[in-house]
């Protein structure tokens, strides 16, 4: 730690760090708390910030007040991002749960997003296995396993073959 940063109050250093973290991408409140609590890598190795629990709470409150931290915005952007990468609703729900987002907030955002999961599942299957999709049972099982791993629901996967004539 340099002499100038060691004289700055812990709250100011935490606030700077929070703004830098949130400037890169949106984070959930739990993610931000975890990153703020982690030691900072300095020239001489990891450095701890001597901050109190009150300092952390003040920083989190400041970030909420000034719009830097918003879990509902984070959830909406996360769902959009992960669905563009080809992940299904089950996987997205699990990842949001790991990031500390409540089940209610996740379900609300999933209802509000306008994503056709069946069409996305079909796109992922055709991207990986080609068009037309195989109708042989053993190949269907491979596709089903792949899509389940990606987080798609069984009903969406079954709709791919149900709507095969489309």
Curated annotation (Swiss-Prot):
Keywords: Cytoplasm. The keyword Cytoplasm applies. Modulates RecA activity. Belongs to the RecX family. GO terms for biological process: regulation of DNA repair. This is Regulatory protein RecX. It is found in: Cytoplasm. The lineage of its organism: Bacteria, Pseudomonadati, Pseudomonadota, Gammaproteobacteria, Enterobacterales. It comes from the Bacteria. InterPro entries: RecX_HTH_1st, RecX_HTH_2nd, RecX_HTH_3rd, Regulatory_RecX, WH-like_DNA-bd_sf. Its main location: cytoplasm. It comes from Shigella boydii serotype 18 (strain CDC 3083-94 / BS512). Disulfide bonds: none annotated. It holds the Pfam family RecX_HTH2. GO terms for cellular component: cytoplasm. The keyword Cytoplasm applies.
């Amino acid at each position: 730690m340099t002499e100038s940063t060691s004289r700055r109050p812990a709250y100011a250093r935490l606030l700077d760090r929070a703004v830098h973290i949130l400037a890169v991408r949106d984070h959930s409140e739990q993610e931000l708390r975890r990153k703020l609590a982690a030691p900072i890598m300095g020239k001489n190795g990891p450095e701890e910030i001597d901050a109190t629990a009150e300092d952390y709470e003040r920083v989190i409150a400041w970030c909420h007040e000034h719009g830097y931290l918003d879990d509902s915005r984070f959830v909406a952007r996360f769902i959009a991002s992960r669905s563009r990468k080809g992940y299904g609703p089950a996987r997205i729900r699990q990842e949001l749960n790991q990031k500390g987002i409540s089940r209610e907030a996740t379900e609300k955002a999933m209802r509000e997003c306008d994503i056709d999961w069946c069409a996305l599942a079909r796109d992922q299957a055709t991207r990986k296995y080609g068009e037309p999709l195989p109708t042989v049972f053993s190949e269907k099982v491979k596709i089903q396993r792949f899509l389940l791993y990606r987080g798609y629901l069984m009903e969406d996967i079954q709709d791919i073959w149900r709507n095969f004539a489309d």
